[in-house]
């Protein structure tokens, strides 16, 4: 039988991946009932996602919500400062979603 897990975390990970839908599909396939997935993104104000000068990807809130909407229920999301680059804080968002 295939192993199922209760908790997944990807904090400061998705910034290294542009198209993240496949990540969410894999996580969903490994979820036990009501499993939680906690992840962060760097905020992108445009559509979908973009590769930044920092060589990291930023994702829009709408892009993420469209991907998770049929696989997970969003329990919480908060705007945060995810890291500091030099003297500048980088805007991000942390999500807590639950498998449906």
Where in this protein do the model-derived segments appear?
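A conserved beta-strand element that flanks and buttresses the S-adenosyl-L-methionine
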Residues: 9
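Acidic carboxylate diad motif detector
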Residues: 39-41
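Short conserved loop adjoining the S-adenosyl-L-methionine
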Residues: 1-3
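Hydrophobic adenine-recognition pocket in adenosine-nucleotide-binding enzymes
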Residues: 13
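Short alpha-helix
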Residues: 56-77
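A short glycine-rich, Lys/Arg-flanked "PGG" loop and its adjoining helix->strand segment in the class I
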Residues: 21-36
């Amino acid at each position: 039988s295939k192993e199922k897990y209760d908790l997944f975390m990807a904090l400061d990970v998705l910034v290294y991946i542009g198209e993240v839908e496949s990540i969410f599909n894999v996580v969903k396939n490994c979820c036990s009932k009501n499993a939680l997935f906690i992840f962060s993104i760097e905020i992108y104000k445009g559509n979908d996602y973009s590769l930044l000068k920092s060589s990291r990807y930023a994702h829009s809130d709408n892009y993420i919500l469209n991907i998770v909407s049929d696989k997970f229920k969003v329990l919480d999301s908060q705007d945060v400062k995810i890291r500091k680059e030099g003297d500048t804080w980088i805007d991000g968002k942390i999500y807590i979603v639950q498998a449906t």
